Amino acid sequence: MTIHSPQPVRPGHGLTVADAMDPCDYQIGDDSTVDQADDVLRGAHLDYLLVRDHDGRCEGLVTRTGLHPFLNRSWYAGRTAISATTHQRGPFAWPTMGLALAAIAMRIKRLAVWPVVDEDGYILGVLMADRVTSLLAGKAV
């Protein structure tokens, strides 16, 4: 008779993106202007906004840093649509993706924030690199 001692569970083992994602309340349409996005970012004290297309599907993520080149020219910022700017675009995370795999993808892409979408491309939330790291390390967040 062989006695097996229980194996310690690795921190983060079995976790998915759904376990770690946060809701995202701020979104902007891809046809909105750079000025409008900047107003929302400043007014809500945000670092990023999720961008959605005309059907409501996730188009990407825009940051203040990404808008900076357009904001230097006020006449340009008022006329340039978010869709014409360089911003983070897909592929995006999905809720059933393993959290360890998502962490690797975020590290390779150097992402601090990653949109999470459903199978139709609609925004479900965001994955924050700090939260992923904490959960995988086994720390309570």
Go through each PLM region and give its residues.
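Tandem CBS (Cystathionine beta-synthase) repeat/Bateman regulatory domains
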Residues: 1-141
